[in-house]
């Protein structure tokens, strides 16, 4: 019986585990894994193809080749299972044990593991406190190392050459011991007392002051503590036994023609065994030391190559001069085990084919070719055939299917019914790249796809292919149906907009049908209902665009909500509309008013329409509505018959004159340049400006001419109406093309760029209708070619960014409903340059309020803290003019391993509060990565056209209200009575009658204020003006000018104006000054009062000093009298170097990698008063004195622009030296909220420029992951080391434990890690190793004996479990709860049994309660 049961033992449930630990294996551990020692380098006998005994494929060690058959054939078949054959020594068992049984090689001499030696920082070096070079010299037998100095003056671990060694031996005899090779290193490692070392290091860390030492000790301490904690002995880094991989994992495959294909590992193992055997023999023969040493070195090298080929010295090569693939190469990189096999598996039950359009499908359907369906659903069909009794065996069923008998097709129809399939289009950039559909069987070989889902898949029908996958199990089908069905995914997860928006033909049809024309056929008629309109239209009595009056029945929501009352009631009203709109009103879902259709439907409008439908009528009605819109759009587009011809491209009549005028202006500039009035650069900039303006003007003229057409109205008068020109309609509706493209067809092509990004100053004045000449065509080719090259580069870069983002966020999942925090971030409307870039409603929609939202007028609470702000809420808030709302964000969430639903808010792809289990991290990464390919790659050179457009010279109010200045605004009144601004960061606000901020404008230094604080103004009033071309240097005090260090030819040069003959002094660039002395001085002005004394800053002993920057034109003379507010010098903005602005993808990557910009601006470290100390060579010294009187110094390069002045009070984190901000400084000085605002706004700027909408919360989620580690400042009583970086949740858990035990918790600083760094420093070594730098990650983890708790998604995919997100999260929770209850039940039963029957150590107890 037992033997019978043994048969069923085969199918074991794989073991359930919750964590994976990695460590170093001790020699004994390796021997315990092994099934025998591999003694010979032979593989198989090439005549018999049987493995050699004791060789690399030995059947005795690794198991039989055929199932249940020993090698010599004495025992065959199942009945001998488990017998060990006495002839060949092979155990009779399954052949697949050859995949899991390991062997070993006993090394004749120990060998260092190359990973722990060469993977930087060298772990061996850290433990031994020796340099890598020294250890290498010892290991590779170039030097001796002292192991035990005995009574000699030598030091332990001292390195000596062979010569030294022999001299010392002569001197001291065998007083001391020195060794070579791995034996020596092993001895040293064994002699280390880790506990003792850790103690001394900790005390030294406390006592030392030097930065470098602290760093060095902390590193070493970390490694030693890791050994101490993990219980791994350091000498295990030296191998005495080498494990041998099971043979099936390094197969030897016979090719035809008697040759073999072999895995490189076999070669590497053969070398090790050969050298090892040779060394054994040499040792037995007592060969000379030098020969043995050489052999040992070769063995070390052979093992190095096996473990990580090419890590040290030249890589071992095979017969074909190709480096052999070692164990390390097997797991790392794109083709390694992690990314190729564990994260990138192939899928069974799948097919792929070309897609074609399926306009007759419903949104949730796809057309599946019959042949493909037959193949995909084969197993189901077999089953049905057997159940129905058509076929008795699988073989018969197979035959039926192959012959494609009629019964098979009937069964296929039945099997496929309500069995969804998943369609995927590569590249899958976001979750809408895979959606489920119900298959509809079709003839032909192409898959039919519904047109509305194309936007989500980013698919078109120019030959795209898609893959089909079949969910097999019932659970999989259910999830596909409820979560992935196309009709359940109608919103983009990136921004919550509808994804099923019509495009192209559909838009054109709807637009054409909803346009109105003057004096169309049947204008002015009235109809009693829509059916009458349709009849009139079908009888050609009216045209689609004619204006008519129609009685329209709308279904409106019933006010009466009592039981049994209908949800919608009809309401009839008369509308002035057009025939087309009236006909379309038929398909409106109940609950939407006709007014949403009563306008020309352009693409944006249709999107808004579908969005409104979704919010008001729910998912189901929206899907039906979208489908009907599509059907109508296609039908109407066909009826419209819109086509284009050359005559539709109307070239504007004014083009000739506009271009002629421009050419004249350019000639004039050339003349000025020839006579030396303007520089070459200025001429070029001006020419480029003229042509870009001309191009605009021609384009504008063209659009004006194209967009309207003359028409005779009903009264017989001529009037103009919006044009029915085909090209104009296509662009206007958003169906195809844009104003820019039309400009190229009918305006002028304009300026072209060279491949390096600079603009060619000769424009293409022709357009495509007129045709290009050869030169113009040639210039055009530049752009086209660069476009293609850019696209390829962009795709790769964008993919890499997405990969890094996914990796850093993959373990962020919503794990609870509410973390209960009251923290949040104050959200305001985003205003730039006085314009609202993003309204408050868009920023808070779908968020949870962190504190009560209060009506500013009545002070009543509108929405309590914890309320989800939906569309109605944000409309209320906007209507009441509330301009700041505190909302919960992912950054302030206090959930430890994950996020809570309240802090995240609405799930944008579903339109309701996010569910527990949603993998919000991955969604965020996809939302940011997916539009990456739309971003530009280039860095913009600001200069010429681009900067000209951006120069403003005044600022005016856009709304009525009161002017308010911010605290940092300072100004002086000059002799003319004008107010001149002298603050660098002043801003003017405009507030409305209740004091709410409506606009905010930056007022630059040197501007003249036209309105003062508190002034009531009307919209359009100018607030301030300034000179856009120069930046002034202004004095705040009056007096007599006294120059210092202003020497002609040294620090300044005289420039004489060619035209006017006037001379000015210009400050020379530091780098161009001749003498060393001149480089360190700074030209400046002091002021003298009437008595000739220096004017002091009021309230201080400091004299007023006003420095001149490089390039400043000094406008005052030495000894001149100046008044307050007078200009001393001007800096032409042209002479400021054109800063390259990194835009597009590189900018996004730069922000997420948290790179510090070069020439970053400097922020004030403390709050205090500014003063200037003694200048050093080339640097000026800025001192901030804080409130306690401590001084903080900054050294600033002289050419930098200082934004503060003597005596100014600055706040901590305020910018004091101009330059791009450094995110690390923002975090350190202004905190997490300011950092998050900075990163979110900067990333959004890049995407907004390309017109891409991404919700802020996705960026916040990534910032949260970048902040997930903290740096320990004071370790208290915790197990951390000061300066160590640890996971935030780990730190908080540890601190909670300390507080519970009444010990001192640790203090810490927040640190910002770039996404790559953050991915690599994650606590999960499996996830980090599969991302980048596999060797380093695994080495580190092995030494620390790290344990991976499998919290993230990636680790679980790799080990092949359900991921802890979505339904998987619930599954794991339930499984853990069951294990817990099982354990408790087991304990309880055990306790009861002990109580009743007694245990060996104690007799049973008497029942305490008396029997009842």
From Swiss-Prot:
How does the cofactor attach, per the note?
A: Binds 1 Mg(2+) ion per subunit.
InterPro entries named in the record:
DNA-dir_RpoC_beta_prime, DNA-dir_RpoC_beta_prime_bact, RNA_pol_asu, RNA_pol_N, RNA_pol_Rpb1_1, RNA_pol_Rpb1_3, RNA_pol_Rpb1_3_sf, RNA_pol_Rpb1_4
Which cofactor does this sequence's record say it needs?
Mg(2+); Zn(2+)
Q: Where does Zn(2+) 1 bind?
A: 70, 72, 85, 88
Q: Where does Zn(2+) 2 bind?
A: 819, 893, 900, 903
- Which keywords describe this protein according to UniProt? DNA-directed RNA polymerase, Magnesium, Metal-binding, Nucleotidyltransferase, Transcription, Transferase, Zinc
Give me the segments passing through the membrane.
Answer: none
Disordered, as annotated region? 1393-1412
The record's note on quaternary structure and interaction partners says: The RNAP catalytic core consists of 2 alpha, 1 beta, 1 beta' and 1 omega subunit. When a sigma factor is associated with the core the holoenzyme is formed, which can initiate transcription.
Q: Give the protein family.
A: Belongs to the RNA polymerase beta' chain family.
Kindly provide the name given to this protein in its UniProt entry. Answer: DNA-directed RNA polymerase subunit beta'
Q: What species is given as this protein's source?
A: Burkholderia mallei (strain ATCC 23344)
Q: Lineage of this protein's species?
A: Bacteria, Pseudomonadati, Pseudomonadota, Betaproteobacteria, Burkholderiales
Quick one: which gene encodes this?
rpoC
């Amino acid at each position: 019986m037992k033997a019978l049961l043994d048969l069923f033992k085969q199918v074991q449930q794989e073991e359930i585990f919750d964590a994976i630990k990695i460590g170093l294996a001790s020699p004994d551990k390796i021997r315990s894994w092994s099934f025998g020692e591999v003694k010979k380098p032979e593989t198989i006998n090439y005549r018999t193809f049987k493995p050699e005994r004791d060789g690399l494929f030995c059947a005795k060690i690794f198991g039989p080749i055929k199932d249940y058959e020993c090698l010599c054939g004495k025992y065959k078949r199942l009945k001998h299972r488990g017998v060990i054959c006495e002839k060949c020594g092979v155990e009779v068992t399954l052949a697949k044990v050859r995949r899991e049984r390991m062997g070993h090689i006993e090394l004749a001499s120990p060998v260092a593991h190359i990973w722990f030696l060469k993977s930087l920082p060298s772990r061996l070096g850290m433990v031994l406190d020796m340099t890598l070079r020294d250890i290498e010299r010892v290991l590779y037998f170039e030097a001796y190392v002292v192991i035990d100095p005995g009574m000699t003056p030598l030091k332990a671990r001292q390195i000596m050459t062979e010569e030294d060694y022999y001299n010392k031996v002569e001197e001291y005899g065998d007083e001391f011991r020195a060794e070579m090779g791995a034996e020596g290193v092993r001895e040293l490692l064994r002699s280390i007392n880790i506990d003792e070392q850790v103690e001394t290091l900790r005390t030294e860390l406390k006592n030392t002051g030097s930065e470098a030492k602290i760093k060095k000790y902390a590193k070493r301490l970390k490694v030693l503590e890791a050994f101490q904690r993990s219980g791994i002995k350091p000498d295990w880094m030296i191998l005495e036994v080498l494990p041998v991989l099971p043979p099936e994992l390094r197969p030897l495959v016979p090719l035809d023609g008697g040759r073999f294909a072999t895995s490189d590992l076999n070669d590497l193992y053969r070398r090790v065994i050969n050298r090892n055997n040779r060394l054994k023999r040499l040792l037995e023969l007592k060969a000379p030391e030098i020969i043995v040493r050489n052999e040992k070195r070769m063995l070390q090298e052979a093992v190095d190559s096996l473990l990580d080929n090419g890590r040290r010295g030249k890589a071992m090569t095979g017969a074909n001069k190709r480096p052999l693939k070692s164990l390390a190469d097997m797991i790392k990189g794109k083709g390694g085990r992690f990314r190729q096999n564990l994260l990138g598996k192939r899928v069974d039950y799948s097919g792929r084919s070309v897609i074609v359009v399926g306009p007759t499908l419903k949104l949730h359907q796809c057309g599946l070719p019959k042949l493909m369906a037959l193949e995909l659903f084969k197993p189901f069909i077999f089953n049905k055939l057997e159940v129905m009794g058509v076929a008795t065996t699988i073989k018969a069923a197979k035959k039926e299917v192959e012959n494609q008998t009629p019964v098979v097709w009937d069964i296929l129809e039945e099997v496929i019914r309500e069995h969804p399939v998943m369609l995927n289009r590569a590249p899958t950039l976001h979750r809408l790249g895979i959606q489920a559909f119900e298959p509809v069987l079709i003839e032909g070989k192409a898959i039919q796809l519904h047109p509305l889902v194309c936007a989500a898949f980013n698919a078109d029908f120019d030959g795209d292919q898609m893959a089909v996958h079949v969910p097999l199990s019932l659970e999989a089908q259910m999830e596909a149906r409820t979560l992935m069905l196309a009709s359940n995914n109608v919103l983009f997860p990136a921004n919550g907009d509808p994804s099923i928006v019509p495009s192209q033909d559909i838009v054109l049809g709807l637009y054409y049908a909803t346009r109105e024309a003057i004096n169309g056929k049947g204008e002015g008629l009235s109809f009693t209902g829509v059916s009458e309109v349709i009849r009139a239209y079908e009888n050609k009595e009216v045209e689609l665009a004619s204006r008519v009056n129609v009685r329209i029945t709308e279904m409106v929501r019933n006010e009466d909500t009592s039981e049994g009352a209908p949800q919608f009631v009809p309401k009839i009203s008369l509308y002035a509309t057009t025939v087309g709109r009236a006909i379309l009103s038929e398909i409106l879902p109940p609950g939407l008013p006709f007014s949403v259709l009563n306008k020309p439907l352009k693409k944006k409008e249709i999107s808004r329409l579908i969005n409104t439908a979704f919010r008001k009528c729910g998912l189901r009605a929206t899907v039906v509505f979208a489908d009907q819109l599509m059907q109508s759009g296609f039908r109407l587009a066909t009826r419209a018959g819109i086509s284009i011809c050359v005559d539709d491209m109307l070239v504007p009549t004014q083009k000739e004159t506009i271009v002629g005028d421009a050419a004249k202006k350019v000639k004039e500039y050339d003349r000025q340049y020839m006579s030396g009035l303007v520089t070459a650069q200025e001429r070029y900039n001006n020419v480029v400006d003229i042509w870009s303006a001309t191009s605009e003007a021609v384009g504008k003229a063209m659009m004006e001419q194209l967009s309207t057409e003359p028409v005779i109205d009903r009264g017989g008068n001529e009037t103009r109406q919006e044009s029915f020109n085909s090209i104009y309609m296509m662009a206007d509706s958003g169906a195809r093309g844009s104003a820019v493209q039309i400009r190229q067809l009918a305006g002028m092509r304009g300026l072209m760029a060279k491949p390096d990004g600079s603009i060619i100053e000769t424009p293409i004045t022709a357009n495509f209708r007129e045709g290009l000449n050869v030169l113009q065509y040639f210039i055009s080719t530049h752009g086209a070619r660069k476009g293609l090259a850019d696209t390829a580069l962009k795709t790769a870069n964008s993919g890499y960014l997405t990969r890094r983002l996914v990796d850093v966020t993959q373990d962020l999942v919503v794990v609870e409903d509410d973390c209960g925090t009251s923290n949040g971030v104050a959200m305001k409307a985003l205003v730039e340059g006085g314009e609202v870039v993003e309204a408050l409603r868009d920023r808070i929609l779908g968020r949870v309020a962190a504190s009560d939202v209060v009506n500013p007028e009545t002070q009543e609470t509108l929405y309590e803290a914890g309320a989800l702000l939906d569309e109605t809420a944000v409309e209320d808030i906007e209507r009441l003019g509330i301009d700041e709302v505190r909302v919960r964000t992912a950054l302030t969430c206090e959930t430890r391993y994950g996020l809570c639903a309240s802090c995240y808010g609405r799930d944008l792809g579903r339109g309701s509060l996010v569910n527990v289990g949603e993998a919000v991290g991955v969604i965020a990464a996809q939302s940011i990565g997916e539009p990456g390919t739309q971003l530009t790659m280039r860095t913009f050179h600001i200069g010429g056209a681009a900067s000209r457009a951006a120069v403003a010279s005044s600022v005016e109010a856009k709304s009525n209200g009161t002017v308010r200045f911010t605290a940092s605004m300072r100004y002086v009144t000059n002799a003319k009575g004008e107010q001149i601004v002298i603050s660098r960061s002043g801003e003017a606000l405009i507030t409305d009658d209740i004091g709410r901020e409506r606009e905010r404008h930056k007022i630059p230094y040197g501007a003249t204020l036209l309105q003062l604080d508190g002034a009531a103004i009307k919209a359009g009033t100018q607030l301030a003006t300034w000179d856009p071309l120069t930046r002034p240097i202004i004095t705040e005090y009056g007096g007599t000018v006294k120059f210092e260090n202003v020497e002609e030819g040294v620090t300044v040069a005289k420039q004489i104006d060619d035209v006017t003959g006037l001379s000015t002094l210009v400050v020379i660039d530091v780098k161009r000054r001749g003498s060393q002395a001149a480089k360190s001085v700074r030209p400046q002005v002091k002021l003298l009062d009437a008595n000739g004394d220096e004017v002091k800053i009021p309230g201080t002993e400091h004299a007023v000093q006003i420095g001149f920057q490089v390039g400043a034109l000094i406008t005052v003379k030495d000894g001149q009298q100046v008044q307050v507010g007078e200009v001393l010098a001007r800096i032409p903005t042209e002479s400021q170097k054109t800063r390259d602005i990194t835009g597009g993808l590189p900018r996004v990557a730069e922000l997420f990698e948290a790179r510090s910009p070069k020439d970053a601006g400097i922020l004030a470290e403390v709050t205090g008063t500014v003063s200037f100390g003694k200048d050093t060579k080339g640097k000026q010294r800025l001192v901030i004195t804080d409130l306690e009187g401590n001084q903080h110094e900054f050294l600033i390069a002289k050419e930098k622009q200082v934004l503060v002045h003597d005596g100014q009070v600055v706040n901590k984190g305020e910018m004091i030296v101009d330059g791009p901000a450094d995110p690390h400084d923002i975090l350190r000085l202004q905190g997490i909220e300011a950092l998050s605002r900075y990163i979110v706004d900067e990333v959004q700027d890049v995407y907004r420029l390309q017109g891409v909408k991404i919700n802020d919360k996705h960026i916040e989620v990534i910032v949260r992951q970048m902040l997930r580690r903290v740096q320990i400042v004071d370790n208290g009583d915790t197990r951390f080391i000061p300066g160590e970086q640890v996971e935030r949740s780990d730190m908080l858990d540890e601190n909670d434990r300390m507080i519970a035990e009444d010990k001192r918790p640790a203090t810490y600083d927040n640190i910002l890690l770039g996404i790559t760094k953050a991915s690599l420093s994650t606590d999960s070594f499996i996830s980090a190793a599969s991302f980048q730098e596999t060797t380093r990650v695994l080495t580190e983890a092995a030494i620390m004996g790290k344990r991976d708790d499998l919290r993230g998604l990636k680790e679980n995919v790799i080990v092949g479990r359900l991921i802890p997100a979505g339904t998987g999260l619930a599954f794991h929770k339930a499984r853990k709860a069951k294990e817990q209850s099982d354990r408790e039940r087991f304990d309880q039963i055990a306790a009861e049994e002990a109580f009743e029957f007694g245990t060996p150590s104690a007799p049973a107890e008497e029942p305490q309660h008396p029997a009842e």
